[in-house]
Amino acid sequence: AWDQRIEFVNQNGMAALAAPTVERWCSGGFHASGSAKLDEMRAMVSATPATGFIGCARALQGLDYHRRIGEISARALFIAGSDDNATPADNMRLMHADLSGSEFVELSPAGHLSNMEQPEVYTETLRSFLG
């Protein structure tokens, strides 16, 4: 998927990537709400320099969260959106299972940017974890 997005940006620019990216990041209910945050997210993606996006995409292509997750000794909290198409909640559950002592919270309804869709619940979850 990353190679296709990189090629798309090279051919069409970041503005053309904004709508499909935000579509993938957010839950259907959030889209249906017509929140002004959707326009803010599209503007953010559009304003991202193509070279920055491509560099991040290349970095994410080879990222393997599971390979060394057991080496983490710090407390960890996994927050997943129930409707996250970018990093599905099941993937987060696997990481949680692989990291002893970690905590897992699924926010619903929420997509990849659960902090934008459920800001109060997300913030309270984080505050509670941090103590």
Each PLM stretch: what is its role?
Residues 1-20, 24-25:
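Flexible "cap/lid" loop of the alpha/beta hydrolase fold
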Residues 3, 35-39, 89-93:
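Short, surface-exposed alpha-helical segments at coil->helix boundaries
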Residues 9, 45, 84-87, 111-117:
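Glycosyltransferase donor-binding loop in the core domain
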Residues 19-20, 38-67:
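Hydrophobic, aromatic-rich cap/lid helix
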Residues 21, 57-60, 95, 122, ...:
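Hydrophobic "lid"/C-terminal helical patch
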Residues 72, 78-80, 84:
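Short beta-strand/loop motif that positions the catalytic acidic residue
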Residues 74, 88-97:
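Short alpha-helix in the alpha/beta-hydrolase fold that links the catalytic acid
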Residues 101-131:
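Catalytic active-site module of serine/aspartate enzymes centered on a nucleophile-bearing elbow/loop
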